[in-house]
């Protein structure tokens, strides 16, 4: 049955208008975004197929093209639409980190870093450069490595901090292996980085390790204290 023949209270778009987006299930929100399904399959049924296949929104939005396009009703246009969603969310979070309130919300920082790093198959090292009010001046990818190793040069991080006239820095990298526990090389690198930044009066606020949906904070675990 076509969605147009459903009771108004069960149609995702009408339900959203009446009750707000929070009242919709993941599949219903996806259906609103996809707009149409396929022959003999409504947008809601297509959305449910996607959720059954991938199990979560995170897995869906980070899935490769071949896996998504293997679902009947998912063409390249719809796949492209899906790719835009996490990027829009990442940019929205980046804007929130630039507001006068700065980094008052650790959850926003975690979400931003998770959206930026979790989908990547290689280890990538990023830096958030902050002003004296903890507002983000810039976010830069500085190093990219193999699946299990990234060469990080503290002097380059310090150089970029000076270029941005940053008062403090947050660094982060991902573990594509799925384990967010810092390695000994992570701890050693953080010690070197903290010392290099200290020489130019720039504070290292935190180092995050991102692995899938998990984010490890050096600051929260007291590991920054041992790094200086």
From Swiss-Prot:
Short sequence motif named JAMM motif, residue ranges: 173-186
Keyword Protease: yes
Alphabetized GO MF terms: metal ion binding; metallopeptidase activity
Record keywords: Hydrolase, Metal-binding, Metalloprotease, Protease, Zinc
Residues that bind Zn(2+): 173, 175, 186
Keyword Protease on entry: yes
Pfam families: RadC, UPF0758_N
Coiled coil: none
GO BP, sorted A to Z: proteolysis
Residues annotated as domain MPN: 102-224
InterPro entries, A to Z: MPN, RadC_JAB, RuvA_2-like, UPF0758, UPF0758_CS, UPF0758_N
Annotated disulfide bonds: none
Family the entry assigns: Belongs to the UPF0758 family.
PANTHER family per the UniProt record, alphabetical: DNA REPAIR PROTEIN RADC, UPF0758 PROTEIN YEES-RELATED
Protein name, per record: UPF0758 protein Reut_A2732
Origin species: Cupriavidus pinatubonensis (strain JMP 134 / LMG 1197) (Cupriavidus necator (strain JMP 134))
